[in-house]
Amino acid sequence: MAATAAAALAVTDELALPLRAVGDLAAAAGVSREEVVVITQCASLGGKLPFADASVGSVLAVIKKVENLGNQFITEISRVLKAGGMVLVQSSPSDQDPNNSIERKLLLGGFVDVQASAASSQDNEHSVNIKAKKASWSMGSSFPLKKATKGLPKIQIDDDSELIDEDSLLTEDDLKKPELPVVGDCEVGATRKACKNCTCGRAEAEEKVEKLNLTSEQINNPQSACGNCGLGDAFRCGTCPYRGLPAFKPGEKIALPGNFLAADM
């Protein structure tokens, strides 16, 4: 009948297992020697162990031939071991480098904290001890992963930094309302004469006035003693100073067209 549970299990592919090895396993597992179940010639089991799942606290495997510790047998050891249980493999050195081979098999079998060390017995027979633990989590277990939510990057605002008021950069002269020059005024004083490099049109107007033999006063403030001067040439006498000029209203500046006197040029 198959056993249901054991505090510790010692297996070997040989006919017998030394009591010293059983004592070492009991000490490592923290149990008495009587609580250790021993199985010899494990290769004849066909890679199966007569124990229920997660029913053994610790396992010691004393292997003479590395090929007897196959992947199937390591999977079986992992099945019967409790979560977090220890497995200790003792093997003799050989040309097949059992240290590297067994370590790799244990890692591929899901064991963790795999550590190897050299040891020697009282009869000076050298061996390799490889210790590992079964993971505390169950094979095939799953758990939800929390996806990190990406928020908008936070802008670090330095409260000590002061914002500059744009208005404070303006001077008093900048705030003054600009004074636009009077249209037609060259700003040459009370005489209001055109300047040398006149560009406002005053020089042309003065030239027209000179050709008419009229004063600026007569152009800017025309008056008529007879009352007919402002009506046009049809009503003006032969000696009228405004003869040839367009009609105007007394007291209002006479508007001379741009092509006035063009025929005289």
Curated annotation (Swiss-Prot):
[2Fe-2S] cluster binds at C186, C195, C198, C200. One of its GO terms (cellular component) is mitochondrial intermembrane space. It comes from the Eukaryota. Residues 186-200 are annotated as: Fe-S binding site A. Its main location: cytoplasm. [4Fe-4S] cluster binds at C226, C229, C237, C240. Keywords: 2Fe-2S, 4Fe-4S, Cytoplasm, Iron, Iron-sulfur, Metal-binding, Mitochondrion. Residues 144-175 are annotated as: Linker. GO terms for molecular function: 2 iron, 2 sulfur cluster binding; 4 iron, 4 sulfur cluster binding; electron transfer activity; metal ion binding. A motif (Cx2C motif 2) lies at residues 237-240. Residues 226-240 are annotated as: Fe-S binding site B. The C-terminal domain binds 2 Fe-S clusters but is otherwise mostly in an intrinsically disordered conformation. Component of the cytosolic iron-sulfur (Fe-S) protein assembly (CIA) machinery. Required for the maturation of extramitochondrial Fe-S proteins. Part of an electron transfer chain functioning in an early step of cytosolic Fe-S biogenesis, facilitating the de novo assembly of a [4Fe-4S] cluster on the cytosolic Fe-S scaffold complex. Electrons are transferred from NADPH via a FAD- and FMN-containing diflavin oxidoreductase. Monomer. Belongs to the anamorsin family. This is Anamorsin homolog 1. It comes from Oryza sativa subsp. indica. The lineage of its organism: Eukaryota, Viridiplantae, Streptophyta, Embryophyta, Tracheophyta.
